[in-house]
């Protein structure tokens, strides 16, 4: 990913790493972006971390706990089931690859991990990093136990983490990750619409394509929330 950016956009220093949630495909590549010795001192305030020349690692509260629960305590079993769920070990070829709905394949590279130097602990918290304004919305218990959306007001852009992906995502995943709460998931998407829907001109997420235009963004988010709420409500009804 870094090579792709540098090839097409040029080389830029990494000022911070923001990890949206506690799933390995969203934090496991961090060693490709920064070295451990470059991580900012977590005993410093976030302002001092940013001024130190080191790289803050910013996550939602609970990130470390849930990353360890899923990938260490349950890691072996989940890893084996993932091989079946995603077809990771199938050789590429006309009869040998499995698409995943939110992507054409899964990385088979080395997994890395770093603890955060700073945790977002409440919705509405704002940071400015290298001139870019950021506002965070915590969404615990949605697609991941620890997750957050991020609003970039200068760009009218809403990063929906993995809470909206252009598909019906898993409420229960075959690899054995924690079951997701459809009602909470829908509620936090609805909250995002209430907070940012009036101004958002683009929404993007950690899988699949962006959605452009205010009406498109709002329809996309409303429809995604409705899917999870409907499944939750119909399950309780019947």
Q: Residue ranges of each PLM-predicted region?
A:
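A generic secondary-structure signal for well-formed alpha-helical elements
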Residues: 5, 9, 37-44, 59, ...
